[in-house]
């Protein structure tokens, strides 16, 4: 019983010394306790450590009291005998020594604790309120900066209601704290609480225009963010009757002036509910100037305007329809004429090109027979005869070269004689002439290969073979591709005609309109490339 009384008296004296700030008396008390410990248990620190953990009726330890009262000398003396677990002991107010020092703005004690145990800045109370939050809401900028320097991530700690320190600092208009938090991590601006509110939602509830500007400068994309009730920052600023903040929000071109919340209300609807005052008039005027509307008019046109438009449409419907039909008929007729003209020009250009190519082929074939390699006999009974006349390659060359010459001459005669006024007749002539030119081209190719075998000689026949292997696939591939395009064009023409008939029968044009467009459709339904 006497031992309990002694401990009680010791504790009372100990707490009295701490509260009075009498360091010498406290040291004497601790020294006496340490001396007794040495005699009884030979453990000088256990009794003092136990004394550091003792709590008074309010649940406060000696370290807690010195931190709360900003007794730095007492605190530095006691902290030598304390551990992290001792500092983390909470009082009945649900705060530990570090928490209460941060909340009350005791910078020296906060820095000392951060130096010893940096992890203290992440220890929260029962409501998950961090020491940073407690210091921020009290506008203790130096303490906030000290904790952010040690651990910048502690700014992202949220309370049980989902709010960060920026939410509350923005609500109370603590500009210095807002700047410090955003400077460390701008991502904190987009954090939403359990009501879906960002820091901007909270800031517009206050009266600090600078805080709202600071948040929007950090991230203007949250301008149209909605909370769980569908309210944007403009809704809340209007409902709270904040004319300056409302005007600031409306200066952003990205703002949704007519955003509708879950109650189907716009900012204009909320402005109408405000009590009559100068602020309400300023807000209403700013919203009207920005083009704000009531929720009942969003998504549908004004009835009077719609009725006026309907009457005007009915009045001019017949005249405008007739004029439009006449313009359309003239336009379609003009397009059809231009298209037919383009067809004729294309066919004529092809005809001219074929004539030039045919003349070129004939010239080459004619000159080739008189410019043979090896030249001719100049003496004897065979004067004028080619030196290579006896070779098979020369004979093949003469045959194919003559064939190419005669075909080219025939094409030239046809081109300069026949005149086809109709486009379809021109296409038929060009189609036949094209096939003749294919034959002339093939003969010229064969003549070249034949004379190549004669020129290189038997010892270098590999050169002629190489030329043949190189040229034959190119020419054969080209002619095969052209044949493919020709046959595809022929086979598709019948299908296209049937499709045009079905399409024409399904259209509900008037007789006069279809009469004008039928020819145009027939002429305009064509491939980008036509093979003749």
Curated annotation (Swiss-Prot):
It is found in: Membrane. Keywords: ANK repeat, Membrane, Repeat, Transmembrane, Transmembrane helix. GO terms for cellular component: membrane. It is a multi-pass membrane protein. InterPro entries: Ankyrin_rpt, Ankyrin_rpt-contain_sf, PGG_dom. ANK repeats lie at residues 9-38, 58-89, 93-122, 127-156, 161-190, 195-224, 229-259. Coiled coil: none annotated. Gene3D superfamilies: Ankyrin repeat-containing domain. The chain crosses the membrane at residues 354-374, 396-416, 436-456, 467-487. This is Ankyrin repeat-containing protein At2g01680.
């Amino acid at each position: 019983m006497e031992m309990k009384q002694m401990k009680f008296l010791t504790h009372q004296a100990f707490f009295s010394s701490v509260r009075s700030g009498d360091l010498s008396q406290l040291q004497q008390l601790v020294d006496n306790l340490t001396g007794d410990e040495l005699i009884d248990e030979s453990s000088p620190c256990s009794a003092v450590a136990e004394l550091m953990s003792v709590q008074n009726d309010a649940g406060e330890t000696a370290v807690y009291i010195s931190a709360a009262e900003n007794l730095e000398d007492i605190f530095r003396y006691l902290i030598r005998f304390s551990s992290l677990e001792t500092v983390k002991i909470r009082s009945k107010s649900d705060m530990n020594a570090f928490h209460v020092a941060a909340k009350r703005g005791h910078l020296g004690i906060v820095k000392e604790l951060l130096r010893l145990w940096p992890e203290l800045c992440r220890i929260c109370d029962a409501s998950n309120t961090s020491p940073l939050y407690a210091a921020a809401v009290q506008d203790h900028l130096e303490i906030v900066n000290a904790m952010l320097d040690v651990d910048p991530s502690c700014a992202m700690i949220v309370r049980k209601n989902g709010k960060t320190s920026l939410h509350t600092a923005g609500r109370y208009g603590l500009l210095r704290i807002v700047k410090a938090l955003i400077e460390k991590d701008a991502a904190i601006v987009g954090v939403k609480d359990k009501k879906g509110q960002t820091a901007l939602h909270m800031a517009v509830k206050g009266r600090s225009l600078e805080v709202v500007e600071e948040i929007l400068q950090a991230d203007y994309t949250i301008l149209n963010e909605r909370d769980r009730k569908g309210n944007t920052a403009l809704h809340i600023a209007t409902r709270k009757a904040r004319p300056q903040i409302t005007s600031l929000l409306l200066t952003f071109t990205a703002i949704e002036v007519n955003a509708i919340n879950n109650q189907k209300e716009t900012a204009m609807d909320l402005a109408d509910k405000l009590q009559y005052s100068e602020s309400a008039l300023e807000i209403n005027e700013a919203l009207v100037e920005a083009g704000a509307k009531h929720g009942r008019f969003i998504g549908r046109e004004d009835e009077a305007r719609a009725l006026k438009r309907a009457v005007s449409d009915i009045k001019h419907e017949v005249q405008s329809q007739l004029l439009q039909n006449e313009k359309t008929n003239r336009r379609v007729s003009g397009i059809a004429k231009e298209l037919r003209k383009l067809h004729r020009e294309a066919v004529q250009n092809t005809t001219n090109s074929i004539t030039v190519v045919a003349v070129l082929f004939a010239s080459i074939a004619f000159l080739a027979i008189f410019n043979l390699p090896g030249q001719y006999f100049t003496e004897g009974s065979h004067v004028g005869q080619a030196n290579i006349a006896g070779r098979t390659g020369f004979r093949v060359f003469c045959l194919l070269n003559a064939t190419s010459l005669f075909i080219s001459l025939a094409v030239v005669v046809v081109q300069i004689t026949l005149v086809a006024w109709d486009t379809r007749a021109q296409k038929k002539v060009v189609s036949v002439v094209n096939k003749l030119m294919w034959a002339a081209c093939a003969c010229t190719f064969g003549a070249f290969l034949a004379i190549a075998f004669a020129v290189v000689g038997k010892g270098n026949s590999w050169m002629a073979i190489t030329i043949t292997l190189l040229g034959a696939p190119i020419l054969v591939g080209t002619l095969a591709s052209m044949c493919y395009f020709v046959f595809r064009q022929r086979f598709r023409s019948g299908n296209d005609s049937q499709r045009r008939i079905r399409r024409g029968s399904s259209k509900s044009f008037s007789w006069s309109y279809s009469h004008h467009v039928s020819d145009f459709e027939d002429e305009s339904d064509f491939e980008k490339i036509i093979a003749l």
